[in-house]
Amino acid sequence: MQQRVVIIGGGYGGVALATQLDDVADVVLVEPKDAFVHAAAALRAVVDPEWQERVFFPYDQLLHRGRVVQDWARSVSPGLVRVSADEEIEADHVVLATGTAYPFPAKFLEDETAVVSARLTRMREGLSRSERVLLVGAGPVGLELAGELTSAFPHLGVTIVEQEDDILAQGDYLPELREAVRTQLADRDVVLELGAPLGYLPPVDVGIHFPFTV
């Protein structure tokens, strides 16, 4: 009799393990989303509708033998995972692969692909009507998003606010890399506000076209 492996989380790690064990174990993947999200392409999906369609991979096509339970894991104990008030899954092995969370649009917290797609479309349409956009954080994600925005919307004025005194302040980045990125940002007329922590969050949600001042 095959061992049952319950994997909690359907991100990169959880999906990789589930597919590798699918032929040799009774695999149950517990994940609230209806599709795997290729998060590395999320920022390109903000500006490109074709990429928006490519970042989602339905879980119902993931496993040949195992199954996917679209729900949250409510509790975990040795040999048992509770996913709802009336459903428990017995397990020989439990793997926690819950991953990390980042603000939209770097990652998506919504469980339904249709909801995320609508939000991406709304953001893209809002960007096309905007004159200026504010990005908070000059780390790798903020800088990548700045590059995507300035490439897709040349008319858009981009300002990056960063509380540290330089870009890419967290991490062992070479000074030459920082200088090269600063040059690219300047060539795209991106305004850097360094050493300037944001006093308060804007009064609108991320990706909503609405004038504000901070």
Listing of model-derived features with the role each one plays in the protein:
Residues V68-R82, I89, H155-V214:
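A Rossmann-like FAD-binding core segment of flavoenzymes
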Residues T19, E125, R182-T183:
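Alpha-helical segments flanking ligand/cofactor-binding loops in enzyme cores
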Residues G10, T98-G99, V214:
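Glycine-rich, N-terminal phosphate-binding loop of Rossmann-like dinucleotide-binding domains
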Residues Q2-R67, E144-P175:
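Beta1-alpha1 glycine-rich phosphate/pyrophosphate-binding loop at the start
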Residues V133-E148:
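Short strand-loop-helix active-site module centered on a catalytic nucleophile
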Residues Q2-R4, H64-L134:
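FAD-binding core/adjacent interface of flavoenzyme oxidoreductases
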